[in-house]
């Protein structure tokens, strides 16, 4: 397989490797570094070598491109699309009521219909301006929609004028109402507009690719690296990327030169739509990949990139943020583009975020994922040598800043402890003191948990706390807080994680409970025994 070959044959740590291959690697790094001039303070890149990022948002200001973009964002907003759909339905009802009711001079329903026609006319004009006439009229349904709106608007104006004539021809007015019924057909393709609005609403302020008739939650992180959300089918395609549109994009923009990386453990799709050019890495949502998978991923990408300078990769999880950003940062660190993981994570977040829409950061937010990118930086520095999976036993867990967490004594909490190599987790309950003994220091907000019958852990390990208390907020995994770590990176048999380094308490919405002094300290002792649990 290409993945294994990549692991064994592409790393610069191979010592006496082929000089030509090393030169090629250096050229790739030089080209990439030349493309990026990264400002660590401003978190911006300068585009060089003639590359224009098609997913790059326009520069704010009084310019045509920005005004078109703003107009498009407004007219395709989910609320505007929903309002338009409702007005189409109301307009249909008014047309039927007006048609079957006896003719009345100066009928107020005619004026309502004219008001709706005016709204539809303005809405179509805004869509033409936002998309641009060339792109708008390329789609047959847009052209037909425009014709119907303009045609029925003229009919509405004529009908109102005839209503105000001293001797209005009733039969002609009725005929015009009948003709206006063709506007009902607009409801058929309004579904498309609602889907587009829903996708923009769900993607929030992630950069979208909105060129060449596409509107996808898809970002060029680099010229040959794409981050995107899941290519979806069925109901999910109504608010995420439609898999057929993603396939059309790949086949038209990068024909024969793309490879997809699916990082979702929870869902997959028909690979034949992408001609079988899909590799899969199973990573649970909001969790971290094994360090071995990080190495395999980077080696696979490098092997694919070397085959042809036109080859690109498209990486996705569900939303195209956490797992996607983690693995893309792994590849960028391997290239040597960034000196450290922190700058690499900041770069990905800036590339994925459209600040014209909002300032919400759309990068890797989960602390454990960021921690593992930092681990990978250390692996690369060590010549791609994975750390030893040192057997360890957790002797004590200390919870800091517990005064504002539930009852303050940890009695509402329980937790699981599990290394990746084991399927059955170790469980402990603080309130029942199951597999643990608890000592509380209320005056300083400390809860000490001494583990009993603790198992030996090795390598990737997760500690996840749970609670049934409504006073303690839960987030991902229905857990108030959890975290991943690797035993090979534990120093001095102690691991301390502050609030911002814990998954879920890092979010500001939990800070009324998990205050600034909230932290966890884990105490270990090394054990060379090989018993498992």
Could you say what each language-model-derived stretch is?
Residues 111-189:
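Voltage-sensing domain
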Residues 194-313, 335-363, 396-533:
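Cysteine-based protein phosphatase catalytic domain of the PTP/DSP
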Residues 75, 97-100, 129-133, 157-161, ...:
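Structural motif corresponding to the C-terminal cap of alpha-helices
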Residues 105-112, 137-139, 194-204:
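Interhelical loop segments of eukaryotic multi-pass membrane proteins
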Residues 357-395:
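Catalytic cores of secreted or luminal carbohydrate-active enzymes
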Residues 1-111, 164-193:
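Non-transmembrane regulatory loops and terminal regions of cation channels
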Residues 185-193, 338, 365, 370:
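Eukaryotic cytoplasmic intrinsically disordered
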Residues 310-330:
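A phosphate-binding catalytic loop at a beta-strand-loop-alpha-helix junction
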């Amino acid at each position: 397989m290409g993945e294994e070959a990549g692991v064994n044959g592409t790393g610069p740590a191979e010592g006496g490797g082929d000089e030509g291959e090393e030169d090629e690697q250096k050229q790739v790094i030089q080209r990439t570094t030349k493309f990026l001039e990264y400002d660590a303070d401003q978190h911006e890149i300068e585009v060089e070598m003639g590359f224009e990022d098609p997913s790059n948002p326009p520069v704010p200001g009084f310019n045509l491109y920005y005004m078109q973009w703003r107009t498009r964002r407004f007219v395709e907003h989910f609320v505007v699309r929903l309002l338009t759909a409702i007005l189409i339905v109301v307009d249909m009802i008014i047309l039927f009521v007006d048609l079957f009711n006896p003719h009345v001079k100066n009928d107020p329903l005619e004026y309502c219909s004219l008001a709706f026609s005016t709204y539809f006319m303005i809405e179509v004009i805004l869509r033409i301006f936002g998309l641009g006439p060339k792109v708008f009229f390329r789609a047959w349904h847009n052209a037909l929609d425009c014709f119907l709106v303009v045609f029925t608007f003229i009919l509405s104006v004529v009908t109102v004028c005839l209503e105000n004539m001293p001797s209005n021809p009733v039969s002609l007015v009725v005929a015009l109402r009948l003709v206006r019924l063709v506007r009902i057909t607009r409801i058929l393709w309004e579904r498309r507009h609602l889907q587009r609005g829903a996708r923009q609403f769900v993607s929030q302020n992630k950069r979208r690719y909105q060129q060449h008739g596409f509107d996808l939650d898809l970002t060029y992180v680099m010229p040959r690296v794409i981050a995107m959300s899941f290519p979806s089918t069925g109901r999910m395609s109504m608010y995420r990327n439609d898999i057929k549109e993603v396939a059309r994009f790949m086949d038209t923009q990068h024909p024969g030169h793309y490879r997809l990386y699916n990082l979702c453990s929870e869902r997959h799709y028909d690979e034949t739509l992408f001609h079988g050019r899909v590799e899969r890495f199973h990573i649970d949502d909001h969790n971290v990949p094994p360090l071995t998978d990080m190495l395999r991923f980077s080696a696979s990408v490098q092997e694919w990139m070397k085959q042809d300078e036109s080859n690109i990769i498209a990486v996705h999880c569900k939303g195209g943020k956490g797992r996607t950003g983690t693995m893309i940062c792994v590849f960028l660190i391997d290239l040597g583009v960034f000196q450290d993981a922190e700058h690499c994570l900041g770069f990905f977040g800036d590339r994925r975020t459209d600040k014209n829409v909002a300032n919400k950061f759309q990068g890797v937010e989960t602390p454990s994922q960021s921690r593992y990118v930092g681990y990978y930086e250390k692996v690369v520095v060590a010549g791609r040598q994975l750390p030893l999976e040192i057997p360890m036993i957790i002797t004590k867990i200390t919870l800091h800043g517990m005064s504002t967490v539930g009852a303050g004594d940890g009695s509402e909490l329980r937790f699981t402890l599990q290394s990746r190599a084991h399927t059955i987790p170790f469980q402990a309950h603080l309130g029942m003191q199951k597999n643990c003994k608890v000592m509380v220091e209320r005056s300083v907000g400390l809860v000490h948990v001494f583990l009993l019958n603790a198992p030996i852990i090795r390598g990737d390990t997760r500690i996840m706390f749970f609670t049934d208390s409504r006073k303690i907020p839960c987030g991902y995994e229905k857990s108030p807080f959890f975290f991943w770590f690797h035993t090979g990176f534990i120093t001095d048999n102690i691991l301390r994680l502050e609030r911002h380094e814990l998954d879920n308490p890092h979010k500001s919405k939990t800070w009324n409970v998990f205050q600034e002094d909230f932290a966890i300290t884990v105490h270990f002792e090394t054990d060379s025994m090989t018993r498992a649990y």
